[in-house]
Design a protein with these regions (language model features):
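ATP-dependent carboxylate-amine ligase
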Residues: 1-138
């Protein structure tokens, strides 16, 4: 059995970190599942989220709810990329940062990596967060 590419795929990250690549797609249910997976990991937990696209009028509310879910799950750090992810970051509060520039996000994230860190990257395919994954894997 082989997992589908970029769907909860565990990879070796830089500085001995672990990366869970779930960058292929995103919707509210899949995001909740990803949060649950990350919450069960050992060590410092970092979640990188991109926008959930195609939610229409529900977009703002769904992204705010996600921020609360991530915080309540005990995730240590949240990094957001995309217009709606700004709302997710705002709901999470302390230890969350929003980026408009993907390269700045990659630079900041890379500086946080160590052997005690697990990073989960999740967003709609259109956000191209696979670029973040490719930059932080060993």
């Amino acid at each position: 059995y082989r997992t589908v590419t970029r769907r909860l795929e565990v990879k070796n990250g830089k500085q001995g970190s672990r990366v869970i690549d779930d960058s292929y797609n995103a919707n509210p249910v899949a995001m909740r599942c990803a949060v649950d997976v990350l919450s069960k990991q050992q060590g410092k937990k970092i979640m990188v989220v991109g926008d959930m696209l195609e939610l229409g009028a529900q977009s703002a509310d769904r992204h705010k709810i996600l921020g609360r879910q991530i915080k309540d799950a005990g995730i240590n750090v949240l990094l957001g990329y995309g217009d709606f992810s700004k709302l997710t970051v705002a709901e999470f509060g302390v230890n969350a940062k929003f980026y408009v520039d993907k390269q700045e996000l990659i630079t900041a994230l890379t500086a946080m990596l160590d052997a005690d860190t697990v990073v989960l990257v999740k967003g709609s395919h259109g956000m191209q967060l696979n670029e973040v994954v490719n930059a932080i894997i060993a």
